[in-house]
């Protein structure tokens, strides 16, 4: 009986470990729809198009010319250059590299402020801020526009443009989501 219980515990532990593994999406010019199911996701390569649906843990986007849309992600990290990311909801956002275009709704977990950290140069972030958010902008020539709650802002480097977006003039339909134009 003890051997049977030990075997059951081992199987449960292996199933949990398999579920906790990071899902790796890589290549050049690939296109794919993926359900996160709470998993962490690592995206690498060049010119891929990935749609991540559901709740994701940590999502890392490395490389260049990636186009990624994601529903809900706890932590989003973007490195490399010229990636385009659209996230319906992120808990924290960490960006480094250059010439990224990122659109996201940033919302903390209610216990701590959400965090947005930006390094590199010439990145463009368009953010909807909900609840307390700490925004740290470093590097050169970063552009951050937001609407919603005012963030606490910390800067270093230069030639940044950090400003509140004006109210909606109209609406647009993009990636099956209605957005302010």
Describe the residue ranges of each PLM region.
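Sec-dependent signal peptide recognition
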Residues: 2-9
